[in-house]
Each structure stands twice: as structure tokens, then as C-alpha cells.
């Protein structure tokens, strides 16, 4: 009887493990190269799209250095960065062209390396690092109060619900490090944020409902945390 129980439990554990594996896409298995030079944007974006289309899952980025242009996160997708993973943002300003209109007709001019709009249940987890390379001369054109082109953020989520960002390290943003605008149910925990490479290097700008921020270390050039209320609704 005991042997039968053990066999049943083992079979259940195998089934559970298989379901986890089935719901995870390792981007290196799709051709991504962590050499710090290869542009991995298309491969990672396709993995995000596939996970979301199937109802959800994890996009796993193993240890290595991955150059990317902006990646759009989508509903029910967890972007997981292994320990030793480094995402490097493109240093071409022309790559950050994801402006869009708000519902009131005004135009948003900002952009983000990892961005989402109108999505649900999105997360960024793991102990990897995201480096915006914001100290590059491409992004050195002064304080935003002086006008001129808009510099990109590292994380920019707009009108999203159910956001979890935990444990990752964020560094060297060209502008604000992260911005959660018109979002709801936001959990930010255990982040390490370092950015002294450009003007207006806020660590965290938040304009959201039901947000919890805890256990973060923020060392930046401008405001560590900036609470905003730009949208009365």
C-alpha cells in the first residue's frame, strides 16, 4: 500500500513539474545569445507574445548579458531573470519610439525599455540586473525642464493592473528608473536601484492605486521615490 502511495505521489510530482516546464520558455532555447552584443529583442518579444497568447507563463532569461531594444510585456507573463543575468538597453534613441495617446486625447511622449499598457498580471522577478546604459552620450542632452527629446525609462507601465516587480537590480537609467502610471494593485519588493548617470534619475515614480513598496534600496541622482497624481481618475 505504501509503495502504491509513493508511486502516485511521484507521478503527481512529475505531472506538476512537467506543467511548470511547459509554461516556461527559456529564451536561449529559442536562439537568444547572452554575449552582450547580439540583439535579442525579437526572440524575447516572441516568447512574451507566445506565453500571453497561451494564457500565461514565464519567460526565462538565463545567466548572460543580453542586448535588447524595448520589450512589451503582456498579460499573465512573468519575465524572470536568473542570478547573473544582465539585460542591456539599446543606446540608440531611435529605438525608443513607443509614444501613444491617453484616453483624454493627450499624447504621452515617454518610453521604456520594458513597457506595458493596459495589461493585467505582469511581473518581473529574479535576481538579475537591468542596465539602461543611460550614461551613454546618446542620452546626454540636459534636464527635461530644458525641453528636447524625451529620454527612456527602464520600466514604464501604464494603465496596468496586477503588477509584481521583485528582487531585480535596476541601474543606469537615461531618465526616471521606473514609472507606474494609472496602474492598480502594484507590488514592488526587494529592488536594488542605482542611477547617477543622467539628469532626473528618480528611483521610483508611482501614480497608482493599491500600491505596496517594501524592502528596496534606492541610490539615485534625484528623488528616491516620487508619488504622483497626474491623473485624477
Task: Provide a role label for each language-model segment.
Residues 1, 13-15, 225:
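Short intrinsically disordered, low-complexity coil segments enriched in acidic
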Residues 1-9:
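Bacterial N-terminal signal peptides that target proteins for export
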Residues 9-19:
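Bacterial N-terminal signal peptides
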Residues 21-233:
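Extracellular/periplasmic carbohydrate-active domains that bind, remodel
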